[in-house]
Amino acid sequence: MRIIFLDIHGVLNDHDDLTIHKNKIVLLNSILMETGAKIVLTSSWRYMVHKGDMTIDGLNYLFLTHGLKNMPLIDVIEADSPKSNLSRGQMILRWLKNCRETIESFVILDDLDDRPQGIAPVGQYLVKTNSNVGLTKKQVDKAIDFLKNPLLPLPI
């Protein structure tokens, strides 16, 4: 299975606008169609699932109304807490290690960087977006390359 760990703010929109931009969904769809990848949400939107305000199916439907194809969202990473002190990257790594399916490849789409509280220790799989611009065609091509030609060995 190929996985996209997806942030929303700064990837599917810019930080000045909280709505999902349809042109960014078109770009995300091109990654999904080219690779058959599934999505694990790393965005703060995951808290809606953890709090019980939304389900994975509900989020898939929300994305579908914005043009995302094939309802690809399969999970969200864990909720962080002040006690856990885990970076987003550490939560991604934990998700990978706990996944029951074989992970062929993965990519992280995020506007965070690989500093300790960012994406480390999986920063080499990051396609970093500019939070003022969001996802671009060049980044789409890089993400497709990561998913089709994974960096080996995977850290799991």
Sequence positions of predicted segments:
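Alpha-helical substrate-recognition element adjacent to the catalytic core
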Residues: 2-83
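Hydrophobic/aromatic side chains embedded in well-ordered alpha-helices
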Residues: 1-3, 104-105
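C-terminal cap/substrate-recognition subdomain and adjoining C-terminal extension
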Residues: 58, 62-156
